[in-house]
């Protein structure tokens, strides 16, 4: 791979009055990109007049399900209205019931942990591997109890988790593995697509995702016909609705109404045909950026084990205090200062999650269904303490992310300018380290805002 050399520029930081590394006219390209093919797919549905259907055989939705199952390599796929619904339906289809425990990594999007709550199951958190940012298999076994029913394995930012070790532990204890591949479309683990390894698996089609629809959407994959049938029932009122024939309106299960619509399905089908080419270009663009960043020892770029591929949904960059002449305990202040410097240069360096999931108030305050599921008979009400997850805390403190800017195939020139910005920041490391050493700093999770119940009133009108 050819590494593009940085453009000639002043070494004065923008935060000190210098020129930006990233020209303002070189903005982030809209995502998802919408091609003429995508527009034609949507127009096809509009002309048909079939926007949704009670039938499980609706053409666009069923077509998306077939095509995604083929892409991932599973026997079955069930489409739903969003990624969080996909996870709730998948857990329900896997047999998770009230009072069961579901293991979730301490670092993920909130939906990974609230999905079990909607089934009255108890989320149990496990720390992450600080290199892959995924659930740490070494910490997994200690979290398993006789009540553990499932493990939600998140492929965070697009990198597959260590599935061999996780599935071996799960099989030994008779626990169901559910892949949360919301950020990992197209990523592979030892030659297999993510979403084909667990017993039942989920994807998100939110507009921010690598495979995006025009709004929200979710996909569930499995090789188990019974699980797929149960997912279909949970998707639509608990009914077993035939592809053809009359609807009986008999609810066999307590289900939801989370079926997608045909317009979003058609748009996603079109986007899917373009996904492999976009993945290849993204790999090239991101590889060039990370290749340049790797030359600066103060920035730790994502590591990809040789047995897997990365979808590059989010780029998480850690900082190394020692390379700036600082002690480890100054990682947080250093990250904060570097983040500000990069943003001044035009790089959208932002956090992803401000606190570990177990620090979220919905868990610490037991804000489920009137204190349930924690108050169910026989449930062990474990404390949720951020300090129990040191790797997660460290990663949140010493890293920032780049999101969305790199997804568009034409983002290469923009990412080259981002690399210029990182170089300029590195060249000014002594000045930035001096600022970090005297910065008054409090970690995100200690200052995350908490809205008192009395402050909720009027929040809608204040938007």
Which residues make up each language-model segment?
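PLP-dependent enzyme catalytic core of the Aspartate aminotransferase-like
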Residues: 2-3, 364-463
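PLP-dependent aminotransferase-like
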Residues: 92-181, 188, 459-461
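Conserved small-domain helix->loop->beta segment predominantly found in fold-type I
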Residues: 245-259, 290-361, 434-444
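N-terminal "arm"/small-domain region of PLP-dependent enzymes with the aminotransferase-like
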Residues: 1-53, 402-404, 458, 463
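Basic phosphate/pyrophosphate-binding loop/patch that engages nucleotide-derived ligands
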Residues: 167-176, 219-237, 329, 333, ...
């Amino acid at each position: 791979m050819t590494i593009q050399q940085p453009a000639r520029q002043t070494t004065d930081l923008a935060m000190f009055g210098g020129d930006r590394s990233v020209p303002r006219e070189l903005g982030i390209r809209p995502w998802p990109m919408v091609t003429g093919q995508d527009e034609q797919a949507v127009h096809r549905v509009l002309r048909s007049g079939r926007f949704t259907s009670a039938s499980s055989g609706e053409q666009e939705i069923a077509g998306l399900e077939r095509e995604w199952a083929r892409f991932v390599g599973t026997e079955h796929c069930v489409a739903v209205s969003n990624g969080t619904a996909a996870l709730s339906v998948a857990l329900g289809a896997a047999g998770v019931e009230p009072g069961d425990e579901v293991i979730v990594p301490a670092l993920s999007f909130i939906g990974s942990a609230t999905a079990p709550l909607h089934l009255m199951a108890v989320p149990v958190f496990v720390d992450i591997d600080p290199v892959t940012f995924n659930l740490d298999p070494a910490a997994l076994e200690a979290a398993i109890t006789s009540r553990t029913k499932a493990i939600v394995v998140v492929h965070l930012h697009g990198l597959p988790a260590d599935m061999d070790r996780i599935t071996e532990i799960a099989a030994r204890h008779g626990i169901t593995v559910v892949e949360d591949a919301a950020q990992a479309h197209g990523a592979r683990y030892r030659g297999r697509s993510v979403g084909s390894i667990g017993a039942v698996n989920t994807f998100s089609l939110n507009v921010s995702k690598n495979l995006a629809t025009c709004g929200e959407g979710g996909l569930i994959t499995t090789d188990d016909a019974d699980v797929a049938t149960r997912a279909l029932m949970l998707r639509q009122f608990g009914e077993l609705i035939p592809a053809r024939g009359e609807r009986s309106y008999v609810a066999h299960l307590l289900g939801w109404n989370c079926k997608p619509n045909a317009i979003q399905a058609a748009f996603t089908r079109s986007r899917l045909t373009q996904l492999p080419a976009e993945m290849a270009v993204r790999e090239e663009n991101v590889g060039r950026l990370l290749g340049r960043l790797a030359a600066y020892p103060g920035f730790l770029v994502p590591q990809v084990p040789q047995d897997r591929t990365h979808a590059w949904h989010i780029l998480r960059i850690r900082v190394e205090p020692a390379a700036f002449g600082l002690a480890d305990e100054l990682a947080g202040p250093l990250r904060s200062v570097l983040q500000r410097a990069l943003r001044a240069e035009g790089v959208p360096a932002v956090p992803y999650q401000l606190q570990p999931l177990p620090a979220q108030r919905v868990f610490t305050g037991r804000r489920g269904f009137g204190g349930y599921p924690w108050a169910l008979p026989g449930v062990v009400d474990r404390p949720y303490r951020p300090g129990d997850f040191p790797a997660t805390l460290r990663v949140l403190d010493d890293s920032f992310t780049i999101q969305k800017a790199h997804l568009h195939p034409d983002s290469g020139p923009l990412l080259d300018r981002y690399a210029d910005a990182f170089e300029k920041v590195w060249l000014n490391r002594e000045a930035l380290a001096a600022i970090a050493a005297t910065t008054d700093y409090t970690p995100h999770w200690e200052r995350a805002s908490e809205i008192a119940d009395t402050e909720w009133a009027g929040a809608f009108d204040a938007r």
